[in-house]
């Protein structure tokens, strides 16, 4: 029963979903959207490598025409004095690093850099690298400083300076545009004092901006490099022209700046001409044609009154018909591009590939239980929500939004509701959904697996039960081991006594057996002896000895007396 006077069923906006893969290259965005996979962002893939260095000369004081009459611009003198005091520590730090590098051998040069860093109180690897860069760039900075006079004389905002060593630099006059448009024509007019005040106010604002941008460099130039974002502030509108003219690339200037890959380092300051030489490190960029890095957002989906969450990578690389997982951990991610030094993609399984291509029967889902889950996502002005797990209401027009039992998620655009309420959260819908979504999807029971570290109810209970049983067995084993240790001496004595008793028993039994055998043998011998005596006596009776007829017996010899 509907609770509002304006009931609506989103199933009228849907058609049946086929699980066949979508035609064309790339992932099946329409099919995946029905099971809770939403594409939130697509970016181009850029590769970059360490490039060469360029140099920028920043004029800390604009070129001014000579004032007419006896007009004395005291504001410029005060500005120069303040700026010199401000930059003196920076110049001393640079001199400390560079002067310690005057030794001839390479080993001494490196030792000089370390000594210079020790004098500045820094010692990290990044700071050593920055200091070495300052030393290496000092020769180029010296060549650039020799051209300071020619730089001072020009009135152009950007001018190319080429020394005898073909060192290329770009001379920037940060506030020259203001001078050209406001001050240059005004100095020839009357009222020098008002012009002096106007120049002073501009220079004071510029000085405030200067101290804010170069604060870290003023403390220690080898501590942190100057970011291109800070450099753009001080260079103003001239920086895009520099980037586009000097560093030929198809990338947008804002994209380059937001990447943070363009860095600057102060390498020299000329106090006489009030000029600062900055070394700019510009990487080499190459775009991978046809490659897209896609961010995927997952929400829970409904499957026959069961809440499940699909298992897909949060970021993928889509190139032609190839799909890879892409973490981009070592890459720089900007709003429109991903800058990497190498391809960070990793292969995926065949089942996951088929799933991303639109074969939903190959997808793996995890059953989830809990209250604070990803049940909705807002992308491109359209709301994707699992209304089987959340209370979905529309405030404009007022109604309850229902979700069919066979539908995975609900898609809400401006044609359905202009303001949607998800439990206690309110969202404004601003865009029209231009994709047809299905009302249901089929899923094999084997495709539901417990994978992610969510609240998995029964599975978690089984794991806890197994752990408790294992802990109980371990406790029993420990108790038995303790008892065995305490009874070790008793068990040893008892074992020895038992062994002696067994040996004695064996010896006794052996002696008895030997005695019995000897007795039997003696009895047999006695019996055999008796039989032999009886036999001989009987034989003598039956066979008496023969009569003796010898001569002696017939004629006895007379005895002599």
Curated annotation (Swiss-Prot):
Pfam families per record: Fusion_gly
Residues passing through the membrane, by range: 496-516
Cysteine pairings via disulfide bonds: 71-192, 331-340, 355-363, 387-392, 394-417
Annotated region described as Fusion peptide, given as residue ranges: 110-134
Signal peptide range: 1-26
Site label Cleavage, positions: 109-110
Family that this chain belongs to: Belongs to the paramyxoviruses fusion glycoprotein family.
Protein name: Fusion glycoprotein F0
Gene behind this protein: F
């Amino acid at each position: 029963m509907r609770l509002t006077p304006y009931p609506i069923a989103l199933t009228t906006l849907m058609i049946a979903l086929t699980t066949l893969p979508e035609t064309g290259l790339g992932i099946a965005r329409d099919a995946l959207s029905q099971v809770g996979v939403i594409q939130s962002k697509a970016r181009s893939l850029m590769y970059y490598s360490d490039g060469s260095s360029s140099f920028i000369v920043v004029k800390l004081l604009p070129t001014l025409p000579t004032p007419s009459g006896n007009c004395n611009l005291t504001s410029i003198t005060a500005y120069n004095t303040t700026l010199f005091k401000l930059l003196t520590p920076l110049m001393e730090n640079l001199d400390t690093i560079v002067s310690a590098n005057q030794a001839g051998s390479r080993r001494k040069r490196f030792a000089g850099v370390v000594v210079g860093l020790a004098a500045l109180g820094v010692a990290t690897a990044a700071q050593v690298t920055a200091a070495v860069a300052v030393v290496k760039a000092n020769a180029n900075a010296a060549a650039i400083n020799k051209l300071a006079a020619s730089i001072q004389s020009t009135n152009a905002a950007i001018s190319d300076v080429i020394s005898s060593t073909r060192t290329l630099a770009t001379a920037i006059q940060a506030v020259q545009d203001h001078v050209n448009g406001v001050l240059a024509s005004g100095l020839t007019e009357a009222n020098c004092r008002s012009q002096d005040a106007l120049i002073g106010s501009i220079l004071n604002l510029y000085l405030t901006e200067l101290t804010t941008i170069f604060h870290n460099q003023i403390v220690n130039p080898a501590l942190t490099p100057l970011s291109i974002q800070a450099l753009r502030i001080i260079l103003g509108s001239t920086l895009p022209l520099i980037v586009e003219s000097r560093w030929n690339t198809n990338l947008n200037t804002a994209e380059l700046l937001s990447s943070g890959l363009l860095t600057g380092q102060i390498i020299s300051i000329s106090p006489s001409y009030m000029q600062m030489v900055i070394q700019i490190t510009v990487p080499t960029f190459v775009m991978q044609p046809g490659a897209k890095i896609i961010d995927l957002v997952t929400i829970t989906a409904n499957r026959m009154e069961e809440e499940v969450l699909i298992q897909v990578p949060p970021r993928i690389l889509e190139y032609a018909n190839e799909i890879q997982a892409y973490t981009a951990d070592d890459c720089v991610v900007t709003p429109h591009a991903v800058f990497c030094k190498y391809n960070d993609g990793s292969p995926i399984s065949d089942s996951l590939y088929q799933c991303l291509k639109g074969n939903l029967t190959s997808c793996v889902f995890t059953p989830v239980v809990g209250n604070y889950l990803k049940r909705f996502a807002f992308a491109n002005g359209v709301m994707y929500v699992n209304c089987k797990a959340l209370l979905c209401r529309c405030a404009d027009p007022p109604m309850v939004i229902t979700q069919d039992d066979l539908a995975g998620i609900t898609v809400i655009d401006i044609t359905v509701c202009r303001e949607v309420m998800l439990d206690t959260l309110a969202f404004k819908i601003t865009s029209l959904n231009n994709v047809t979504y299905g009302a249901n999807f089929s899923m094999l029971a084997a495709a539901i697996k417990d994978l992610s570290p969510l609240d998995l109810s029964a599975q978690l209970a089984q794991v806890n039960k197994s752990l408790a049983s294992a802990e109980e067995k371990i406790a029993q084993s420990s108790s038995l081991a303790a008892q065995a240790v305490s009874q070790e001496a008793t068990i040893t004595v008892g074992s020895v006594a038992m062994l002696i008793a067994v040996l004695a028993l064996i010896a006794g039994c052996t002696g008895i057996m030997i005695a019995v055998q000897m007795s039997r043998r003696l009895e047999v011998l006695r019996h055999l002896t008796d039989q032999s005596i009886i036999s001989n006596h009987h034989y003598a009776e039956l066979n008496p000895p023969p009569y003796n007829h010898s001569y002696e017996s017939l004629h006895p010899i007379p005895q002599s007396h």
